[in-house]
C-alpha cells in the first residue's frame, strides 16, 4: 500500500520566488547554450574581452543556481538553506560582470576611445600587481616603478582624454578600471535604470554592515526560510536574472554573424523580455 505524502500550502511569497527561479532557469539555459557554442568566434581586442567576461558570467550563473532553494508543497522551507548573503554576492558579481562586459567589450565606441580604455585597463592591472607584489616583499619591481608613471603620462597625453568630463579624467589618470560612473550607466542603458539602488542594497547585504547584521534575529538571517529571507532572496535573484539575460543577449547581438542561425535566435527571443520583466 502506497503512503500518500502530506502536502502544505505554499505562501504567495514562496510561489513568487519559485516563479522567479523558473525565469532564472530559462535565462541560465540560454546562457549555457550560447556559451557552449562560442568556441568558433574569431575575434581580438574588445571582442576577446567580451567572450572572456561572458564565460565568467556563465560560471557565476551556474554557481548561483547550485545554491538556490527549490521548495515544493511536499518539502518544508527549513530543509533548504536560504543564504541571502551568498545570493547577494553572486547577484552583485553578475551585475558588475555585465557592466564590465558592456564597457570593455560590446559598447559601440570609437577606436580612439577604445584605445584609451585599453591603456587605462593596462595601468590598473599593473598598479594592482605592483601593490600585491610589494606587500609580498618581492624584489625586482623596477619595471613597475618605471612603467607605471610612463603609463600615466601616456593616458594624460591621450587625445581622447579631453573628451571626458573633468571628473572622468581624474578617474582615468588614477587608473581606475572604469571612468564611467554608475550614474553614467543609468543614463545610457535602460537595463541599468536602477543600478545605484540595486548595487547599494546588494553591497549592504554582502558586507557585515549594520543593514546585514541588525536584521538577524531568531528567524531572519538564519537560513530557515522566513518571509524576510525569501523576500531578499527573490530580490537578489531578480537582479541576477536581469543582468545575466542582458549579458547573453548582448553576446548574441554583438556576434551576430556567429549566432545568426535560427536555433540561437529562438533561444534568445525567449529571454529578451526577461532583461526587464
What residue spans do the PLM features occupy?
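A cross-kingdom marker of C-terminal helix-rich interaction/assembly modules
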Residues: 1-277
Amino acid at each position: 500500500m502506497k503512503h500518500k505524502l502530506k502536502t502544505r500550502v505554499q505562501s504567495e511569497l514562496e510561489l513568487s520566488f519559485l516563479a522567479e527561479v523558473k525565469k532564472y532557469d530559462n535565462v541560465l539555459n540560454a546562457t549555457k547554450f550560447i556559451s557552449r557554442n562560442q568556441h568558433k568566434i574569431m575575434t581580438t581586442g574588445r571582442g576577446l574581452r567580451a567572450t572572456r567576461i561572458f564565460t565568467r558570467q556563465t560560471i557565476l550563473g551556474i554557481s548561483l543556481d547550485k545554491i538556490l532553494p527549490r521548495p515544493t508543497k511536499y518539502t518544508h522551507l527549513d530543509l533548504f538553506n536560504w543564504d541571502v548573503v551568498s545570493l547577494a554576492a553572486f547577484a552583485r558579481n553578475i551585475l558588475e560582470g555585465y557592466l564590465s562586459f558592456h564597457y570593455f567589450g560590446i559598447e559601440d565606441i570609437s577606436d580612439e576611445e577604445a584605445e584609451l580604455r585599453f591603456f587605462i585597463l593596462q595601468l590598473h592591472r599593473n598598479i594592482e600587481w605592483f601593490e600585491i607584489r610589494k606587500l609580498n616583499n618581492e624584489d625586482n619591481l623596477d619595471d613597475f616603478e618605471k612603467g607605471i608613471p610612463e603609463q600615466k603620462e601616456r593616458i594624460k597625453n591621450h587625445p581622447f582624454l579631453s573628451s571626458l568630463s573633468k571628473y572622468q579624467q581624474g578617474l582615468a589618470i588614477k587608473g581606475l578600471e572604469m571612468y564611467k560612473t554608475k550614474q553614467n550607466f543609468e543614463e545610457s542603458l535602460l537595463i541599468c535604470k536602477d543600478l545605484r539602488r540595486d548595487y547599494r542594497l546588494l553591497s549592504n547585504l554582502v558586507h557585515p554592515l549594520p543593514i546585514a547584521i541588525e536584521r538577524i534575529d531568531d528567524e531572519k538571517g538564519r537560513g530557515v526560510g522566513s518571509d524576510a529571507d525569501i523576500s531578499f532572496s527573490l530580490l537578489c535573484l531578480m537582479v541576477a536574472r536581469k543582468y545575466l539575460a542582458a549579458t547573453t543577449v548582448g553576446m548574441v547581438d554583438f556576434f551576430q554573424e556567429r549566432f545568426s542561425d535560427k536555433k540561437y535566435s529562438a533561444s534568445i527571443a525567449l529571454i529578451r523580455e526577461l532583461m526587464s520583466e
